[in-house]
Each structure stands twice: as structure tokens, then as C-alpha cells.
Regions:
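Non-heme di-metal
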Residues: 1-157
Length: 157
């Protein structure tokens, strides 16, 4: 599998836990190859216009996401949910960037850094999900917005 195919594999996986599992596995494959002195072919695969998403959370316009007081228990839960959502978007944004720029002659270190960052964001998403679940909630329990992904859409050309 080429690096761009790995990126598209992550981007076309809807479930957050599975998406981050694949992200971690692809990052480990990339790192192992680099440690062995080889470079996985970059390839060229077209990323989807939108990453696959689970059925929840409901995605609202940023102005329509309910405001909550951060000092209240529900406000703290909403903050944790928002951070989990940010982390999942970051996973997609990192892999999207990798898929979009495999046609450019960047040094391998460029891809090393973005693969590492995608892997770290995957870890952060899972930590936030674990935290939400320990509090009796889960990712997707509250609405969120797609504002971060709009930046990728706005720069697709």
C-alpha cells in the first residue's frame, strides 16, 4: 500500500476508533520502513471531498452549536466532547494533507512529520474518548460543527 493509499484508507473510514486504529497502524508501517532505511512509495490517490464520518455527532453550523457554561458538569462534558471532535478532525486534516501533496517533491521528512502528527492526533482522540466514556458519555453524544474541515474544502484547488 502506498502512503497516499494509506491516507485515503483513513479518510474513508467512518468510525472514529477504527479510523484512529488504521491511522496508528499506517503510521507504524511508515516508521518501520523508514527505520529500515526504505521509503514506502508515495503513490497518488485522490482523497475524498469529505472524510467519512460516523452517524453522530450531528454536525451543525458553528453558530448553532449550543453554548454551555464551562464550569458546570454538562459544560465540562461538552468541552471534552469538543476536544475529541477537534482531534478527530485533526486526524483527517493531516492524512488529507499527505494525500493531497504526494505529487509534490517534498523531502521524506515532510511526510515523516505529518504521519507522526496524524498518529499523535489519533492517540489524543482515543484518550478523549476514554475520558468521555469514563464519565458515562461518548463521542457523538453532543452536536459538533465541521468548521475545521471547511478549511480543507476551501483550499482544495
Amino acid at each position: 500500500m502506498t502512503l497516499s493509499e494509506m491516507a485515503v484508507d483513513v479518510l474513508t473510514t467512518a468510525d472514529g476508533r477504527e479510523k484512529t486504529r488504521r491511522s496508528h497502524a499506517h503510521a507504524a508501517t511508515w516508521r518501520a520502513a523508514r527505520a529500515a532505511g526504505t521509503l514506502i512509495p508515495l503513490g497518488q490517490a485522490t482523497p475524498p471531498l469529505h472524510p467519512a464520518r460516523p452517524d453522530t455527532p450531528e454536525l451543525l453550523s458553528p453558530r448553532d452549536v449550543p453554548k454551555r457554561k464551562p464550569g458546570s458538569p454538562t459544560g465540562r462534558l461538552a468541552l471534552l466532547h469538543a476536544v475529541a471532535h477537534i482531534e478527530l478532525n485533526a486526524v483527517d486534516l493531516h492524512w488529507d494533507l499527505i494525500a493531497r501533496f504526494t505529487h509534490v517533491s517534498f523531502p521524506p521528512g515532510f511526510y515523516d512529520d505529518w504521519v507522526k502528527a496524524a498518529d499523535e492526533e489519533s492517540k489524543h482522540f482515543n484518550l478523549m474518548c476514554d475520558c468521555l466514556e469514563s464519565l458515562g458519555s461518548h463521542y457523538g453524544a453532543l452536536p459538533a460543527h465541521a468548521g475545521m474541515w471547511r478549511a480543507a474544502e476551501d483550499t482544495v484547488d
